């Protein structure tokens, strides 16, 4: 979605010309869940004057009940009309930043926090941080009550097409709706697992790209429902098949120059690119809980299913955590492959950016690239070349997060503490559950 710039008068004009009936004021909590306050268009002036208040104590990770009043400040450049509402009273959307009653940005707002880390980047002499995400999702059938089943909508595979790819029509409608909303779609295709799909859209600046991810998730789920399907961004909904990732392709710029590209450098990469990569590798264990934030995330990060389990980098193969795709010039980028679509994109990107800036600031040296298939290396071989494992559970990821300074800098005290508290509760709840697998394995044997 290209960057746009709208004024209050533009918004008034759009609302009148398009006969908009409702305004959806959207923001995101620390768990990555989209929240919104919907108001009739008669409240437009109040919205434009930043006077829309909501109860922050009702939102995960925000504030206590005694300090609950929050204000929504709309980003006018995010104005869009949901195409599927045209026949029932048009609904327009504005993404908002969350402010406190004293007029300052709320430190628990993930979007505002990402902007804070971007200001640190600018203080270091960089102008832009771009992100191209690759979100994947599964489509499941609904039952007669409209509830999701565990029955996939097809048994297709990588790049399959109809009649094997039964999700093709749904995916095509998703693309059409996204394009109507201003997305620049680069490709859409069936993924490796049955019922799994990927739609790639053009990179954008950090905040816009994260806004786009949240919009994308909403559109995918909405249009899937119209096809009597349930779209899920759960990383590993089924055993024995590939999980869903959301690879982050990132690049730093100084003005119009890609700070990662050097035509004369080794692999045509700059020292900045190598230092950024070194920072990502150094802090990877610390930011894993944010990039892979739910118990189920770690069912994806296992050998054999094309997801990274090991902390290494390569310019060639796809088994390490970090890959440098072959494109150069302005397209030079670093791909962080561990991120999954359950992640809060604002927090995940802030974590990766802060990790990379740590590498640049401290002039960290990147280890040698690993160009062989790490999945085929045994533990002794991996240890011999200094390859560490990513955390294998949410518990170990939270432990690594507590021991890492970079991730605390990336999130700020409020989000950092609230996130760890929320996820620790989630882990404690999970570890007391008794699964069907346990009953099948043990109830007769013991």
Swiss-Prot record:
Annotated family: Belongs to the glutamine synthetase family.
Enzyme Commission no: 6.3.1.2
Keywords: ATP-binding, Cytoplasm, Ligase, Magnesium, Metal-binding, Nucleotide-binding
Domain GS catalytic: 110-446
Regulation: Inhibited by glutamine.
Binding site for ATP: 186, 251, 318, 323
Positions of the record's site feature: Important for inhibition by glutamine: 64
Annotated residues for binding of L-glutamate: 242-243, 300, 306, 318, 337
Alphabetical list of PANTHER family matching this protein: GAMMA-GLUTAMYLPUTRESCINE SYNTHETASE (PTHR43785), TYPE-1 GLUTAMINE SYNTHETASE 2 (PTHR43785:SF12)
GO cellular component: cytoplasm
Cellular localization per UniProt: Cytoplasm
Primary role: Glutamine synthetase (GS) is an unusual multitasking protein that functions as an enzyme, a transcription coregulator, and a chaperone in ammonium assimilation and in the regulation of genes involved in nitrogen metabolism. It catalyzes the ATP-dependent biosynthesis of glutamine from glutamate and ammonia. Feedback-inhibited GlnA also interacts with and regulates the activity of the transcriptional regulator TnrA. During nitrogen limitation, TnrA is in its DNA-binding active state and turns on the transcription of genes required for nitrogen assimilation.
GS beta-grasp domain span: 18-103
Name of this chain's protein: Glutamine synthetase
Catalytic activity reported: L-glutamate + NH4(+) + ATP = L-glutamine + ADP + phosphate + H(+)
GO molecular function: ATP binding; glutamine synthetase activity; metal ion binding
Subunit structure: Oligomer of 12 subunits arranged in the form of two hexagons. In its feedback-inhibited form, interacts with TnrA in order to block its DNA-binding activity.
Superkingdom as given in the UniProt entry: Bacteria
Cofactor binding note from Swiss-Prot or TrEMBL: Binds 2 Mg(2+) ions per subunit.
Gene3D superfamilies in alphabetical order: Glutamine synthetase, N-terminal domain (3.10.20.70), Glutamine synthetase/guanido kinase, catalytic domain (3.30.590.10)
Cofactor entry: Mg(2+)
Residues annotated to bind Mg(2+) 1: 134, 247, 335
Residue numbers binding Mg(2+) 2: 136, 191, 198
Top-level class of the enzyme under EC nomenclature: ligase
Natural source organism: Staphylococcus epidermidis (strain ATCC 35984 / DSM 28319 / BCRC 17069 / CCUG 31568 / BM 3577 / RP62A)
